[in-house]
Regions:
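Flavin (primarily FAD) cofactor-binding/catalytic cores of flavoenzymes
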Residues: 1-58, 71-216, 225-390, 402-566
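Short, basic/glycine-rich phosphate-binding loops at helix/coil junctions
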Residues: 63-71
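Post-kinase regulatory C-tail/linker adjacent to protein kinase catalytic domains
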Residues: 389-397
Length: 566
């Protein structure tokens, strides 16, 4: 079997590795001179392909964005600068000797499908034949340019966020950004203290979430857990949104700052930024309404306000596309592509896509688990359902996204990290059984349930399991703390540490007494009432008790977390 991988970025590298683990003849084509994809920073905006900004720092922590059998160095910062991410990808590629399978500076011009194979036409004129093909070119290649009324009057510069690299050339300029996604906020923060003014124009507004959560911990180590997922599933949708909106409102009043959207918190892809509130409050950034029209050197908003503008940066996302593919191989309509589990084309299961997904979480572990699944299917160790079943699953997923998210073409490839990882892991056979682990090692089972759902979890069992997975999981709290512990505080060193502290902060006895009484009384009422009252009354009491218990656990999640782990 001969497999072609297109792209040697964060999705291409684990795809190569998955292939060589099963002895597959794999060739990867990379159009740039190095691995890394977006993370391979190329400051020349005319260079081929997309790339990060000079100041880009990831929005997911290192433990949550690691490949499942290759933890990053423990002393690296939790939120890594893009240079660290690129270094990590190089370390991964070197460790598993992946670079020798990559043909650099080689552009795939065209891919055609003939019977049971693919012909890959290269820019240099060569044509290579492959049995299978894995597309790893992502969804940040083709910028989406909006239609703007009256833009012909504007005499300033217009550019897309895709072309932004650094602050050079923006000094002393009036900059307006159209859009309020993560890229828009990163650029606004980057320019805030060197530009004359920075204005963010938003049509809908957004909920702003912080990377650094309670106690200074990375948010994803606290909230991307099986426990949290379970809580969000059992409590009503409205209550779940109220809970998260209350959290973000504590940091910044979204009404006062002009940010509150019409949609609920879970109806959008998270917008993550820790600096925005301070910069708005300090006058470095303005939040404005949607753009209505333009003057020569101004933008005029729909509420009538106008802002000076020398440079307009459109932060309006990207179009999904595969310009090198025949349209009959894989169609893209309305920024949607029909892929089973966002991976396999029902029309041609010899073609698979890795990384064509927008997770609430990191793309790296998701790309890796997709690659593992693909290779097992290619090797006929796993089978796919019928074409009709795959199409039905795709339609179900589309309806779920439309029900949950506000109507936008950017919400066509959304998934929740834990749920999606579990879904694919179940297909592979690498999802751990917590009930089995509970009887063997209750403490470790609790760690898997309450602790961060790190990628190493999916190497405990199943194909290509990793012997170091359990140790890596156990020491995640320590690895999160190590880069922060540059100085030991004298009083803290005298505190007694133990297992209790790992999950609970210093507990007020008054607080414990109060809650203990509530539980005791509630349980007593439920038990003593028995069936002496009506069945309906009894079940109402039971329901009330468990609702109280659930909210108690939710409150625990707010108050007690990993922040005291050594």
């Amino acid at each position: 079997m001969r497999v072609c991988v297109i792209g040697a970025g964060a999705s291409g590298l684990p795809s190569i590795k998955a292939c060589i683990e099963y002895g597959i003849d794999v060739v990867c084509y990379e159009k740039t001179a190095d691995i890394g994809g977006l993370w391979n920073y190329r400051p020349n905006e005319k260079d081929i392909g997309g790339t990060v900004m000079a100041s880009t720092v990831v929005n997911t922590s290192k433990e949550m964005m690691a490949y499942s059998d290759f933890p990053p160095p423990e002393d690296w910062p939790n939120f890594m600068h893009h240079t660290k991410v690129n270094d990590y990808l190089h370390m991964y590629a070197d460790h598993y000797e992946l670079k020798k399978y990559v043909k650099f500076n080689t552009t795939v011009q065209h891919v055609t499908n003939e019977d049971d194979h693919f012909n890959v036409h290269l820019k240099n004129g060569d044509v290579e034949r492959f049995d299978k093909i894995i597309l790893c070119t992502g969804h940040h290649a083709e910028p989406q340019h909006p239609q703007l009324k009256g833009v012909e009057k504007f005499k300033g510069r217009i550019m897309h966020a895709h072309s932004y690299r650094d602050t050079k050339g923006f000094e002393g300029k009036n900059v307006v950004l159209l859009g309020i996604g993560n890229s828009a906020l990163d650029i606004a923060v980057d320019l805030a203290k060197i530009a004359k003014s920075v204005t963010i124009s938003t049509r809908r507004g957004t909920w702003i979430f912080n990377k650094v959560a309670a106690g200074g911990m990375p948010y994803d180590t606290l909230y991307m857990t099986r426990y949290y997922n379970w809580m969000m599933d059992i409590i009503p949708w409205t209550v779940a949104n109220d809970f998260m909106e209350h959290l973000v409102q504590q940091r910044m009043d979204h009404d006062l700052y002009g940010l509150r959207p019409n949609h609920r918190f879970f109806q959008q892809h998270p917008t993550v930024n820790d600096a925005l509130a301070n910069l708005i409050c300090s006058g470095f950034i303005n939040i404005a309404d949607d753009i209505d029209t333009f003057a020569a050197d101004k933008v005029i908003m729909k509420n009538g306000r106008s802002f000076d503008c020398d440079i307009l940066i459109t932060c309006t996302g990207y179009n999904i596309g595969f310009p090198y593919l025949d349209r009959n191989i894989l169609k893209v309509e309305h920024n949607e592509v029909s892929l089973y589990k966002f991976v396999f084309s029902p029309n041609n299961v010899n073609l698979a896509v890795v990384g064509m997904i927008q997770p609430i979480g990191s793309i790296l572990p998701i790309a890796e688990i997709q690659a593992r699944w693909i290779v097992l299917v290619f090797m006929k160790k796993l089978s796919l359902p019928s074409k009709q079943a795959m199409l039905e699953d795709i339609e179900v997923k589309r309806k779920e996204m439309k029900r949950r998210y506000f109507n936008s073409e950017k919400h066509t490839i959304q998934v929740d990290y834990v749920k999606y990882m579990d879904e694919v892991a179940t297909l592979i056979g690498c999802k751990p059984d917590l009930w089995k682990i509970l009887f063997k090692d209750p403490k470790f089972a609790w760690r898997l349930f309450k602790g961060a759902n790190v990628p190493y979890v999916y190497r405990l069992v199943g194909p290509n399991k990793w012997d170091g997975a359990e140790e890596a999981i156990r020491f995640v709290p320590n690895r999160v703390k190590i880069p922060l512990k540059a100085r030991n505080c004298r009083m803290r060193s005298h505190k007694r540490r133990g297992t209790l502290d790992e999950y609970f902060r210093y507990i007020s006895m008054k607080w414990m007494a109060g809650w203990s009484i509530i539980f005791f009384v509630s349980g007593l009422v439920v038990i003593c009432s028995g069936t002496s009252t009506s069945i309906l009354s009894y079940f109402v009491l039971v329901a009330m008790f468990f609702v109280l218990f659930s909210f108690m656990l939710l409150w625990f999640d707010l108050q007690y977390d990993m922040t005291t782990i050594l």
